Amino acid sequence: YLCDEETVHAMLRDSDLLPLDRAIVEDMGVDALNADSVASYRRQFKSRRSDHPWVGLSDEDFLLRIEALRLDGSQVRPTRAGLLMFGEAWRIASEFPYYFLDYREIMGDRDRWDDRFTSEDGTWSGNLYDFWGRVVNRLRSAVAHPFRLGADLHRIDDNPMDKAVREAVTNALVHADYFVRRGTVIIQYYDRIVLSNPGGLRLSVDEVVQGGISDTRNPTLMKMFNLIGIGEKAGSGFDVMREGSLFAGTAEPKLEVFDNPDRVQLTLYPRKFAGSAEGCMGGYSVDTAPSDTALSPENG
């Protein structure tokens, strides 16, 4: 079996002992990061961890602690994770030429999208943090919210399928290989959500589905999300999505792997429709082939 050049480069990146997202981005400074994105992230961090010693730090010291920045001799420079999380899209693309984030809504029977935004449209930062918030806000409408009361008799608006959707979006972003073509694409159809990201699985499909094992391609990015309550503990992400499907009474998530170029695709079925995927329940399917509102503590 002969691998093409792109596959060989991907294999070499994945074999590196030092996480690639922790590497310093040379020739960039702190100004490469979007100040509004950093400020929003810090508000979420403070909301979840109000007594944490990092709350009172300056922006630069805070970003050093979460490894969005690192010291390069006497200079402070962004890490790849910091640039992806908080940078402007045009600055990110100078380090990751194939960087592209794409969200679409297709509600009809045709493939024509009804709404769309991408990291390249120039109306927002185009970074991962802001993409996460924007996408999760949009996908909330895809989830049914039956009336439920908590022990305090207040309505519970968040449910296991909401958590499953957030986990799926997080996984697509932190497991992507941003050096690979075609970008990360999330499409909301009327009956399903399809999330695909560049890069192959670092575990077998069975290991992903069974859970308990984690091998994150971008662990520094994962840590940044975890610090504000986004993303589940290592190896439990598929369980969270499975629990969401069980709550909603729909088919379990469908995981597919493609190559040339390597790509992973996950399909979620967030709500029931007449004649829809709930009839497939009973086993997982496997084929081998943040505004501040969205990033609130309740959305962890």
Region roles according to the model:
Residues 1-169, 173-182, 188-193, 202-214, ...:
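Active-site helix-to-loop segments that bind/position phosphate- or nucleotide-bearing substrates
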